[in-house]
Amino acid sequence: MQKLEDMNLIDNFLFQEVARNKEYGGEFCRIILETILGREIKEVEIDVEVEKSIPGATLESHGIRLDALVKERDPRRMEVSTGSGAATYFDLEPNNYKISDPARRGRYYQAVVTSEHFGKGLDYKYLMDTYVIFILSDDPFGEDRMMYTIRNGCVELPDMPYEDGQITIFLYTKGKYAPSQELSDMLKYIENSREENVSNPSLQRMSDMVRETKRDRTVGAKFMMWWDYEADMKRHAREEGLE
């Protein structure tokens, strides 16, 4: 049985528990996003929703469960229609296993996040920007790159601006060609969240959060229930011949 103390941030249970913490969850997500995007996120409000379930449009359609959905609301960019700051949504998805059909998975996550948070009757110019970010221990495309950034564009005119506000990022923890040393170090720590992999102040802060989360008795109790549930699901899958 895996112990909570041995879990890494690439394990979605630990990632979710750090992100949902009311004291430091927003700061945790801010550090991750700033490192990935290479820019500061400041003078903004950050709301974090963890393990958010979004049902399909009908009972027969496919729903998803988001690991950590972060809303960056910037009061400097006011939306005329709502009178509030313009929002950008970031869906953070750590996965310690090989995901199937990453391109189409990313497409579906984008569609669901957008439709869930775009208000009825709003003009399309108010459609929010959305980032779906997968953090993976397995290379999704087999090109051995640390970062794959996916944007839509025009085939005939690849240099033509086509800003639809939709970006999907796949991060491979062991990949090459890192856009920054900070990102490389952070992904190494996310995959193996040990003190020896702390190499800068931001990672030290993340490590402090991880340590506090693992010491939380409430998290420990939730982990035991989560482990029992996962074990039951695997047992049922074996019995049904699905695993």
Language-model features: locations:
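Accessory alpha/beta interaction modules
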Residues: 1-167, 177-179, 236
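Short, charged alpha-helical interaction segments and adjacent helix-coil junctions
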Residues: 1-6, 13, 69-86, 90-95, ...
